[in-house]
């Protein structure tokens, strides 16, 4: 179920103020955040946001196609180690 339109998208307050301050100054700077649940809004386009994946901050360059998605979608939390070549059970 999607979020109500009258509420609007969720964006963490500290992240929104940092983006607005950089937009006023006209600067492009990496913004570090732990807020994976924040929705990408049009004001974030062109910025690089370092999203925490549980271990490190993954840099995410925000483009127009990302608007409406969550920041956490672009910072994977799990790494897949491939199945071993000799193990036939895992491949079937």
Curated annotation (Swiss-Prot):
One of its GO terms (biological process) is ribosomal small subunit assembly. PROSITE patterns: RIBOSOMAL_S19. One of its GO terms (molecular function) is structural constituent of ribosome. Keywords: Ribonucleoprotein, Ribosomal protein, RNA-binding, rRNA-binding. One of its GO terms (cellular component) is cytoplasm. Protein S19 forms a complex with S13 that binds strongly to the 16S ribosomal RNA. This is Small ribosomal subunit protein uS19. It comes from Acaryochloris marina (strain MBIC 11017).
